């Protein structure tokens, strides 16, 4: 971020501080492969793995595809002061109810509690090689 800001032509940045990270986009409908497709019904379904983790799946029937999201949301609410005023922040809401979205906003800006027991900080501290 510091290196890019010193270069001409580098635009504004935003930091994702909350949201479920897409893990996979399928090229076919998960329900269609089981014979239970509901056309034009962009509903959310849940995949459960062998460790009993639930992965939300958003169906996009128009394109016969799905987006599989991480079982826990990314949340950098504990480090929000690091980014305040340095860049724009973004909170992505995908499967949250209205009440959950309000609770998340309060956790970020009013020091409330997240509506989830578990979350990930992704690669925020570790980086990627």
Give, region by region, the residue ranges found by the protein language model.
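Active-site pocket-lining/capping segments in soluble small-molecule metabolic enzymes
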Residues: 1-129
């Amino acid at each position: 971020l510091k290196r890019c800001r010193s270069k001409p032509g580098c635009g504004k940045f935003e930091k994702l501080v909350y949201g479920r990270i897409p893990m996979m986009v399928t090229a076919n409908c998960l329900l269609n492969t089981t014979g239970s497709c509901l056309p034009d019904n962009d509903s959310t379904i849940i995949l459960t793995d062998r460790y009993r983790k639930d992965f939300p799946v958003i169906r996009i029937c128009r394109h016969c595809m799905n987006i599989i999201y991480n079982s826990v949301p990314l949340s950098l609410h504990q480090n929000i002061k690091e980014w305040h005023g340095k860049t724009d922040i973004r909170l992505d809401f995908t499967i949250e109810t209205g009440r959950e979205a309000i609770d998340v906003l309060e956790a970020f800006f009013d020091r409330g509690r997240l509506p989830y027991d578990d979350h990930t900080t992704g690669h925020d501290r570790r980086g990627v090689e």
